[in-house]
């Protein structure tokens, strides 16, 4: 086998890529593949002896790559178009900074040399996904009472994101007396959850008897996606019972029972007159 030598002044092989970086989409359902092109530049002063080039492409941080053609035979100086296929891992973090390297060796007669390698920075494209749920999406309270919901947001994207909240039917609920405090923005790291408590107040008005289910329509919006990614979620409150402002519910119930009792006695007395 010929002894390996450095590329001499009479023959050289270099790789030149057409771009120094490439963006790869790793979101769910994507191919996670990107293509770049370049040339394999071969120079020799001895066109009588073929230059045989073997190329390979490698990646870091779980990224793989292939180069085509991987073998080249040139008689004299030449420039051969090459294509590099890059495949990233699905759902990779945007923080990843993989590098793809195209390198190889060449032979010309008894001489063996290293191909002048080239590198390309792989940029992981961010994607944004939200999941929201509550451990208590349905709460039953007495009219006039408050309710506290436990909300859990999960950042399912591959980049840190900030979320803002909107109540789609806020006008309708506030118009009948509900108090719905604004929910502060949340910033959550990728693939991480965050829990928050949200208190609402049912209408403070006279209610002799009520048994009604109210729906609060929440919308969570990803700010880093410029509002393109959003998630709807509904919470439910059943107000059941009576409410007279300034009185304890138990006392109100006793008062109503007393009034009902007096009315029944009055009617009974009227029948015997």
Regions found by a protein language model. Give the residues of each.
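Long beta-sheet-rich domains in secretory-pathway and surface-associated proteins
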Residues: 1-273
